[in-house]
Amino acid sequence: MDTLRAGGAREGEPLVERLSTSSEVGFPGDWYALNSADHFWFDWRLRAAIRQWRACGLPLDRPLRVFDVGGGRGVLRDQVEAATAWTVDLVELNRAALDAAGPGRGRHLYYDVLDQRADLLGQYDAALMFDVIEHVERPRPLLDAVARHLRPEGWLLVNVPALQALFGAYDVAAGHFRRYDRASLGAELDGGRWRIDDQRYWGLSLVPLMAARKMLLRQATGETIHRSFGPFNGFVHRGLATLARVETALLPRAPIGSSVLLVARRCD
């Protein structure tokens, strides 16, 4: 195992552990540049997820061992560790993203879960796969590999973009193969390895905005992600952040939404 100090970090800063020899995964740089826990969308996603996890009985106050697959520069990891007692290992194949991640309670792993290292199999209580599987042409092998890293009855926590009718230039620019509904997301977990406990949409209020985005952005360009995801001016951002808080509080199960959250458990 190669242990590399992230981005030339000083003593005490996080280490990147290179566990795989897989080629680095490219990703639109604008996406990482816009990632921030302060961005209304990331805050909205976390609020919706925490509400779902509580409803499903996940023990937020216990020190679960969790791994965040495709966790980027650690925005979700930071949010989850701040909101729970969990220790989250950041798993990523984009070295620049790992270098940009700050310290957390867990490890920073340059690791392809398809490698299925023996020392990591069956070691985790839960896996986070937020906005990952839509980037994978064939998600089943990845999901099977993730399952093998979980303990029996371990949780799989997923978020994906919703409603194929909204698929447009933004999705192309972001590297999406598809958007999901509850049925198509559930179908990815067929095969007897998973028991789905809950699926729910969030972001109902964003659906008309994303429909407008699809109509306005006809072709993916180098500016598509930046134009679609911000940064927004202060007034617009505060309005969307308020909308997120209100919708999450009043509408825990939206009939449709811009994203779908899933909680499943390993049952094989």
Which residues make up each language-model segment?
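Short, glycine-/aromatic-enriched active-site segment of Class I SAM-dependent methyltransferases
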Residues: 30-36, 156-178, 182-188
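A short His-aromatic
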Residues: 131-135
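Feature marks short, surface-exposed loop/turn motifs that line or immediately flank catalytic pockets
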Residues: 97, 164-166, 205
